[in-house]
């Protein structure tokens, strides 16, 4: 097999439509746009969501909720996920990024207590749930709020 000799399978590629090239082409004269009207004109057509003057659907539906611009979002890590580390490891947000337990550190890392922690670790994070603190200390580890 030579890469320069490869050809597409017959029927896999379509030839380009040549518009406005005489009646024999099948797309001559009006070029598939029909006769007159808004959609036949240059730049013609209606904007997305336009319903002919009737109140559009997106305006008929009531507005809901709001975006809280002061919201602080933390990357979440559960205690069961910390079992991948060896005993005595100092777990930091940087280490969690390296081991891909978090994809990105948003406003920081928060540790939650889902699952059982079986390793003795020193965990450094921005926030801890009360049950996560208890779980880490019950396993013999220590916590440190950054």
From Swiss-Prot:
Keywords: Ribonucleoprotein, Ribosomal protein, RNA-binding, rRNA-binding. SUPFAM superfamilies: Ribosomal proteins L15p and L18e. GO terms for molecular function: rRNA binding; structural constituent of ribosome. This is Large ribosomal subunit protein uL15. One of its GO terms (cellular component) is cytosolic large ribosomal subunit. Residues 1-53 are annotated as: Disordered. NCBIfam families: rplO_bact (TIGR01071). Belongs to the universal ribosomal protein uL15 family. PANTHER family: 50S RIBOSOMAL PROTEIN L15 (PTHR12934), LARGE RIBOSOMAL SUBUNIT PROTEIN UL15M (PTHR12934:SF11). Binds to the 23S rRNA. GO terms for biological process: translation. Part of the 50S ribosomal subunit. Residues 21-31, 42-52 have a biased composition (Gly residues).
């Amino acid at each position: 097999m030579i890469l320069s000799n490869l050809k597409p399978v017959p029927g896999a590629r379509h030839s380009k439509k040549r518009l406005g090239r005489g009646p024999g082409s099948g797309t001559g004269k009006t070029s598939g746009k029909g006769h007159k009207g808004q959609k036949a004109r240059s730049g013609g057509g209606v904007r997305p969501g336009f319903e002919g003057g009737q109140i559009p659907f997106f305006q008929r539906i009531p507005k809901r909720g709001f975006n809280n611009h002061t919201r602080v979002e933390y990357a979440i890590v559960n205690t069961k996920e910390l079992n991948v580390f060896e005993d005595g490891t100092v777990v930091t947000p940087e280490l969690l990024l390296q081991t891909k337990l978090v994809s990105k550190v948003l406003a920081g890392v928060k540790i939650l207590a889902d699952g059982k922690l079986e390793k003795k670790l020193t965990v450094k994070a921005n926030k801890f749930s009360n049950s996560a603190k208890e779980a880490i200390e019950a396993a013999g580890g220590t916590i440190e709020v950054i």
